[in-house]
Amino acid sequence: MSVTVPESLGWSPQPVIDWLFSEGRLLDDNSRFVLQLAHQLVACGAPIERLLLTIQTLNPEIAATSNTWISSTDSIVPFSAQHGTLKTDRYIGSPMQQLFETEKRVRQRLDQLPEGAHAAYTELADDGFTDYLALPIMFNWGLGSALILSTKCAQGFSGTDIENFRILRNYLSPIIEVYSLRHLSKSLMNTYLGKRTGEKVLSGMIQRGDADIIHAALWFSDLRDFTHLTETLPARQVLEMLNEYFEFVSAAVTARGGEILRFIGDAMLIVFPIDDDMCQRTACNAALDSAIDAQSTLASLNHRRRRHGEPEISFGVGLNVGEVVYGNVGAPDRLDFTVMGPAVNRTARLESLTKTLGCNILFSERFSELIDTPSSYLGMHEMKGIDGTQAVYAVCDS
């Protein structure tokens, strides 16, 4: 489906501004927002066949996100620019770089390109576009976004068109800033707290003592000989090794619905919550499969590390299932989310036994009853700080 774009015969941005402050500002999805914004502009006579809205982010992997509307297909093309993108030819010398460095609008007639023009211009010109306008969107702390418009009208953008777009940009800025702050908060919460915990904080679970009782499959893992490694390796190499370890474990657990709740030095506390989306058996199988996958990935990773003369990585995993307190604890002005309870303690003690029993993955009796993978009984064992002895199990071929 395509959208018919009118010739520039004079138009007013007021209907679009009215929409922005009524329905538009309530749209939480940026793709839908850009699509509806484009439709509103076309409906009031703006001569555009392409609209792009880009927003800078604070994310360890992504520098900016953008959504591009194209009239010929009436569709949205999303894009996430990795931090490395800023060092590529795609960005260097581009109108986007010019805009973000000067914080001034960029205008270029695409039917009058100079020799050696950047690919961002020539590709649009090859598609029949005649004019390009990029407007900076300023936030309270500086430049945070940009609105980019292109047309195929033979005469390009008129002075009236550009002034109307400038007026619209001024009304658009506070709405995009609020949207950016909301999603920035969500991104930072997910990055530093995890998705489940971040959502709880944003939903208002922020007072000390706020807690839920949840049922979950639990994972506790710990690197072998980490103290020795920190004493003998340069700090930079230790950090690189930790990040490599955390990355492949994260990939294994998040693929199956697990959430890294805490990094504790070289240890990881991970939960597979049992809820409407994941029953008890499913959660336990997911936790075990994640542990097996992580250990499998470790084998190939260590093969590479040996070739490069780097120390191998080794870690144990304790798995358990039970009821835990998932809550907000700490000092009045410094809080943290954590999981507490006897089930958590036993999970950590199971991991400690992986060293003495020579198995990389150990789990409790109740956990063994809920998994589909055959397990081996390794006897009753004492656990530090826990009365009596506890049954310990392992995967048959571990």
Annotate the PLM regions.
Residues 130-138:
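Short hydrophobic beta-strand micro-motif common in sensory/regulatory domains
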Residues 205-289:
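Catalytic NTP-binding/metal-coordinating core of nucleotidyl cyclase/transferase enzymes
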Residues 138-139, 146-156, 275:
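Short beta-strand-to-loop transition segments that serve as allosteric relay/switch motifs
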Residues 160-213:
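Regulatory cytosolic signal-relay segments
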Residues 2-5, 150-166, 339:
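Regulatory loop-to-helix N-cap segments in sensory/regulatory domains
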Residues 347, 353-398:
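Cytosolic regulatory/linker segments at or just downstream of nucleotide-handling modules
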Residues 38, 243-257, 274, 278-317, ...:
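Alpha-helical scaffold within the catalytic cores of cyclic-nucleotide enzymes
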Residues 72-130:
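Regulatory sensory and allosteric helical modules in signal-transduction proteins
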